[in-house]
């Protein structure tokens, strides 16, 4: 059974690049009938936070990237790592190094001066006397000769000379094992068969493979996916709008749209743009992921999210929207939402935008956009609105049909085009926000609100003409 994993560090927000890595790992495990595991790599105790861990867990839940088994926390496994390190020292696979930071800096400076690659020179590789006042680190005895080679599912065959690698630290002087060591122990313990991660880890892979071999562990397969770039060709960062994945939730993106967009960053299946999870499980292949960086395009994501909004069940949107309405300072009943949502599914690109567009249903305009008011409010508009008020006041039943008849009566009685009455009436009711059929707009807000808004518009016109 194939087991994959996602192993983020809780030292900051869970960003788009990490989510894509998790998605690829999740898809491959699902395709193979295997398992997908989650591991929190929190060995950096100073920078790791519980808040970041919660963002990871909540982000995975929101996206539907379910994992099997318990979450593994590296910070709780220190005794396990140190026991292995102690055994390695006893077997001659690792050794203590008493070099001070000053010594190491002098070593690097001398190597640079000679035009050499800065690296640890193996001073304590074959033993040495302890140095008073210095707490040693532990280094792995990397092979001095030969090569490390692996077939990468994305990059193809990668070969590194061992002469390019130094004896890297596997336990710091504070007693905490390092990332490159812990990841090997944990991937072995969790039976990880395929490691999918960002290509910024390529330089770690030969070191880790040598550790696997030294410990007699089965070496997993690797797939190093390329980085994601912003529109300017630079690595995606906050300046491009790259945010915590939960910020996309707050902005009103649907998880299905995020999944769909991310899988297409570096992978394609013909010209198809929109994929269901079932289609991804059928067509996706980690071997078809491109090795070149992908460009993140926010407008493309917004377009894709709009496609999902258009095809999402109205009841589901009505279930999701109250939080976004509340963020805008208003609430609508489920009945109102079910009525008005269909008119915005093709207009809005996010749930937040949809909530902004629908705000007029609950909130009367406090003012009117200057350009719209100049276009709609003419010298005779107040008279037209007053007649409309009279017609609406006379209605016993206030629904879409009766309002439609009242609107038609005003147009007929004054012998004017519908737009001459409809345009200012719509502005008075909605404040210029996108809106459905005018009669429905009136029916949605009710008779009392409709009359108040028309009267407010007349007052506005009187004061500004």
Swiss-Prot record:
- DNA-binding listed as a keyword: no
State the InterPro entries in the record.
aa-tRNA-synth_I_cd-bd, aa-tRNA-synth_I_codon-bd_sub2, aa-tRNA-synth_I_CS, aa_tRNA-synth_I_cd-bd_sf, Glu-tRNA-ligase_bac/mito, Glu/Gln-tRNA-synth, Glu/Gln-tRNA-synth_Ib_cat-dom, GluQ/Sye
In alphabetical order, the GO MF annotations are: ATP binding; glutamate-tRNA ligase activity; tRNA binding; zinc ion binding
Motif, 'KMSKS' region: chain positions: 235-239
| Gene3D superfamilies reported in the protein's UniProt record | 1.10.10.350, HUPs
The entry's function note states: Catalyzes the attachment of glutamate to tRNA(Glu) in a two-step reaction: glutamate is first activated by ATP to form Glu-AMP and then transferred to the acceptor end of tRNA(Glu).
Similarity field? Belongs to the class-I aminoacyl-tRNA synthetase family. Glutamate--tRNA ligase type 1 subfamily.
The protein's name in its UniProt record: Glutamate--tRNA ligase
């Amino acid at each position: 059974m194939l087991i994959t994993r996602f192993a983020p560090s809780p030292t900051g927000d869970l960003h788009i690049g990490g989510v894509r890595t998790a998605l690829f790992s999740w898809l491959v495990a699902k395709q193979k009938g295997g398992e997908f595991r989650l591991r929190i790599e929190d060995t950096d105790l100073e920078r790791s936070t519980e808040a970041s861990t919660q963002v990871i867990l909540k982000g995975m839940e929101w996206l539907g990237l379910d994992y099997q088994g318990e979450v593994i926390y590296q910070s709780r496994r220190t005794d396990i790592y140190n026991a292995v390190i102690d055994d390695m020292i006893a077997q001659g696979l690792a050794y203590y190094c008493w070099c001070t930071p000053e010594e190491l800096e002098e070593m690097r400076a001398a190597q640079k001066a000679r035009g050499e690659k800065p690296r640890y020179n193996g001073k304590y590789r074959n033993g040495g006397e302890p140095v008073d006042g210095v707490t040693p680190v532990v280094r792995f005895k990397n092979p001095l000769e030969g090569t490390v080679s692996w077939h990468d599912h994305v990059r193809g065959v990668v070969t590194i000379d061992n002469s390019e690698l130094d004896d890297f630290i596997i336990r710091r002087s504070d007693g905490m094992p390092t990332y490159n060591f812990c990841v090997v122990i944990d991937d072995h313990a969790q039976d990880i068969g395929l490691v999918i991660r960002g290509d910024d880890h390529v330089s770690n892979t030969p070191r880790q493979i040598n550790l696997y071999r030294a410990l007699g562990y089965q070496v997993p397969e690797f797939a190093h996916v390329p980085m994601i770039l912003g529109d300017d060709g630079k690595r995606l960062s906050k300046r491009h709008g790259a945010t915590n994945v939960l910020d996309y939730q707050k902005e009103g993106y649907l998880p299905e749209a995020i999944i769909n967009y991310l899988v297409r960053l570096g992978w394609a299946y013909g010209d198809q743009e929109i994929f269901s999870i079932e289609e991804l499980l059928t067509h996706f292949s980690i071997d078809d992921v491109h090795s070149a960086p992908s460009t993140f395009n926010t407008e493309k994501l917004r377009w894709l999210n709009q496609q999902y909004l258009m095809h999402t069940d109205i009841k589901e949107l009505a279930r999701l929207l109250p939080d976004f309405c509340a963020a805008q300072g208003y609430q609508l009943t489920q009945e109102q939402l079910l009525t008005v949502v269909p008119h915005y599914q093709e207009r809005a690109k996010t749930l937040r935008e949809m909530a902004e567009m629908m705000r007029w249903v609950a909130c009367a305009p406090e003012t009117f956009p200057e350009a719209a008011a100049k276009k709609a409010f003419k010298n005779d508009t107040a008279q037209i609105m007053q007649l409309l008020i009279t017609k609406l006041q006379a209605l016993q039943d206030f629904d879409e049909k009766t309002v439609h008849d009242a609107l038609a009566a005003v147009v007929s009685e004054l012998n004017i085009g519908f737009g001459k009455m409809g345009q200012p009436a719509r502005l008075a009711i909605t404040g210029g926000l996108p809106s459905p059929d005018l009669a429905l707009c009136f029916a949605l807000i009710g008779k009392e609100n409709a009359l108040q808004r028309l009267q407010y518009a007349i007052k506005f016109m009187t004061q500004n003409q």
